[in-house]
């Protein structure tokens, strides 16, 4: 069985991997594991998402060192693209790039920073939560 890990920014993305992507992948002989990045820890518990890129970088480095993962994915939304992340300077609106162009530039910057051929980044233009609410509003959820 193939093993894929996906670094996600929060609980919604973790649920998406566990309840949507995971079952679909398992029908193809692939096991998908979500890993939620911890951006800070306090006495009241861990915080996930947002934060600085250093937390994502450390976790990605660790996951890429593990040779048993056939693929190492990254699922981020454009709105919460972390401070200090590769390509962050192109993430702000400009006249030269539309949203799709910025998304493409971010993923290119991520692949350049982590050239491991197993690495597969995805920067989603809209928050996963917004897509879920849109599906519910459309009568599909």
Regions inferred by a protein language model and the residue ranges of each:
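Short, conserved catalytic/metal-binding motifs centered on acidic residues
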Residues: 9-10, 74, 132
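Generic local-structure boundary detector
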Residues: 15-19, 23, 27-28, 32, ...
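Activity-critical C-terminal alpha-helical subdomain
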Residues: 77-141
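Short, surface-exposed loop/strand segments
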Residues: 1-70
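A structural signal for isolated positions on well-ordered beta-strands in alpha/beta enzyme cores
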Residues: 5, 73, 120-122
């Amino acid at each position: 069985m193939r093993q894929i890990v996906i670094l996600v920014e929060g609980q919604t993305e973790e649920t998406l991997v566990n309840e949507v992507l995971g079952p679909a992948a398992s029908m193809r002989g692939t096991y998908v594991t979500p890993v939620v990045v911890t951006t800070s820890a306090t006495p009241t518990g861990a915080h996930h998402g947002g934060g600085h890129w250093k937390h994502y970088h450390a976790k990605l480095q660790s996951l890429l060192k593990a040779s048993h993962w056939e693929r190492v994915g990254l699922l981020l939304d454009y709105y919460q693209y972390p401070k200090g992340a590769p390509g962050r300077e192109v993430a702000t609106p400009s006249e030269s790039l539309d949203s799709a162009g910025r998304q493409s530039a971010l993923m290119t910057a991520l692949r350049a920073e982590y050239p491991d051929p197993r690495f597969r980044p995805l920067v989603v233009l809209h928050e996963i939560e917004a897509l879920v609410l849109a599906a519910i509003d459309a009568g599909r959820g």
